[in-house]
C-alpha cells in the first residue's frame, strides 16, 4: 500500500461506531503499517440538528419523512446518517460543489409536505444561503445536520498530542 513509506499518521475513517478490538487488530494486520506509523480509527457522529436560520434546535413536532439534501462527494454517507434518524428518507444529491438553482428548489419543494423535514450539510447550508435560495423552504422544516469526526478507542488526546509534537519538531 502506498502509504506505508510516506505517512507518519494513518486515519481509518468512517468505521462503525462499535468497532471491536478484534476488528481493529484484524484491520491493523491487513494494512501492514510500520511500527513508526501511528494508526487511528474514526467514525462519523451526528450532532444535534439545528435550523438553517439561527441556532434553534429541531422542533419536537412529529415528521414522517426526511429529505437528505446534499451536494457532496459521497452523498451515500450523508443519507446513511439521515437514515439513522428515520428510515423514511429520500436523498436529493447533487455533484460536489453544485450551485443550486431555482429549478433545484422546485424539485425539492415538490417533495416537501407538512410532515417532511429537510436535512442538509453545513457546507450546503452556506451555499444555499449565499445563493439566496434557502428562503424558499419553510424554516420550521429546514435543518442543518452537523456531522463530526470522532476518534474511536479514546484516541483523540493521543492524536492531538502527536499532531502538536509533529508541528513543533
Question: Predicted regions span which residues?
Answer:
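Short, flexible loop segments at boundaries between secondary-structure elements
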Residues: 95-99, 138-169
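G-domain G4 guanine-recognition motif of GTPases
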Residues: 10-22, 42-49, 69-74, 95-99, ...
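Phosphate/Mg2+-binding loops and adjacent switch elements
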Residues: 1-34
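Short, aromatic/basic amphipathic alpha-helical patches
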Residues: 22-33, 82-83, 129-139
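A short, acidic, amphipathic alpha-helical segment used as a generic capping/interface helix at domain edges
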Residues: 99-116, 123-126
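Redox- and metal-dependent alpha/beta enzyme cores, enriched for Fe-S-associated oxidoreductases
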Residues: 52-55, 61-104, 164-166
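Short, conserved loop/helix-junction motifs that constitute active-site signature segments
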Residues: 1-6, 32-34, 60-62, 112-113, ...
